UniProtKB/Swiss-Prot annotation:
Belongs to the DnaJ family. C/III subfamily. This is Chaperone protein dnaJ 72. Residues 3-73 form the J domain. InterPro entries: DjlA_DnaK_co-chaperone, DnaJ_domain, DnaJ_domain_CS, J_dom_sf. The gene is ATJ72. It is found in: Membrane. Plays a continuous role in plant development probably in the structural organization of compartments. The keyword Transmembrane applies. Disulfide bonds: none annotated. Pfam families: DnaJ. It is a single-pass membrane protein. It comes from Arabidopsis thaliana (Mouse-ear cress).
Length: 184
C-alpha cells in the first residue's frame, strides 16, 4: 500500500494548504507534458509518479477520504513496518501484464472474466440482504397473505350461506327472477 503522505512529502498532520502546495510542486515536476521529449523510461516514471501524486492529493484533500484513509492505514501499521521493502511506485522495470501501464494495476482479461461472475453474484447477494429489500419483501409477503386470506374467506362464507349453489348458479337464478318480473 502506498503511503500518500510519503508520496506528497508531508506529515500526517499537514493542513490542506500544505497538501495543496506539495501537490502543485510535485505535479509540475512530474507532469507528463514536461517530459514529452524525455527518453521512454523517464517519461514512464514521470507518468507513474504523476498519477500517484494525483491520487494522493485526491485522497488527502477531501476530509472524508482522508479520515477513511487514516483509519485504514492505522490498521495497516504492522504491514508497513514489517521490515520488508516495497517499492511505493510499484513499477518493476517493465510493464504490468495485461495493461498498458507499469504501476502495478495490471490484470489479465481471463482473470477479469472469471471474477465478473463472482462480483455479479456478490453484488446481487449484497442487494438481496439490504434492509430496504428485506422490508419490501416482507411487505409484499404480507400483502400476498392478506389477499389470499380475504379471497379464501370470501369463498368459504359463500359456501356456508349458499350450500349447493355456485356463484354462477346464483347469478342465473337472479336473472331468471328478473325476467319473470318483467314478463308478469
Amino acid at each position: 500500500m502506498v503511503d500518500h503522505y510519503q508520496v506528497l512529502g508531508v506529515t500526517r498532520n499537514a493542513t490542506k494548504k500544505e497538501v495543496k502546495d506539495a501537490f502543485r510542486r510535485l505535479a509540475i515536476k512530474y507532469h507528463p507534458d514536461k517530459h514529452a521529449q524525455s527518453p521512454e523510461h523517464v517519461r514512464h516514471n514521470a507518468t507513474v509518479r504523476f498519477k500517484l501524486v494525483s491520487e494522493a492529493y485526491e485522497v488527502l484533500n477531501d476530509d472524508l477520504k482522508r479520515a477513511s484513509y487514516n483509519a485504514g492505514s492505522d490498521s495497516d501499521c504492522f504491514r508497513r513496518t514489517s521490515g520488508s521493502y516495497s517499492n511505493p511506485y510499484g513499477n518493476r522495470g517493465g510493464r504490468a501484464q495485461g495493461s498498458g501501464y507499469g504501476y502495478g494495476y495490471g490484470y489479465s482479461t481471463r482473470n477479469r472474466q472469471a471474477s465478473s461472475f463472482s462480483s455479479g453474484f456478490d453484488s446481487t447477494f449484497r442487494y438481496l440482504t439490504t434492509r430496504a429489500f428485506l422490508l419490501n419483501l416482507a411487505l409484499a409477503g404480507g400483502l400476498y397473505f392478506a389477499f389470499t386470506a380475504i379471497d379464501t374467506s370470501g369463498e368459504t362464507l359463500w359456501k356456508m350461506r349458499n350450500s349447493g349453489k355456485s356463484f354462477e348458479e346464483a347469478m342465473e337464478s337472479i336473472e331468471k327472477s328478473k325476467s319473470h318480473k318483467d314478463e308478469g
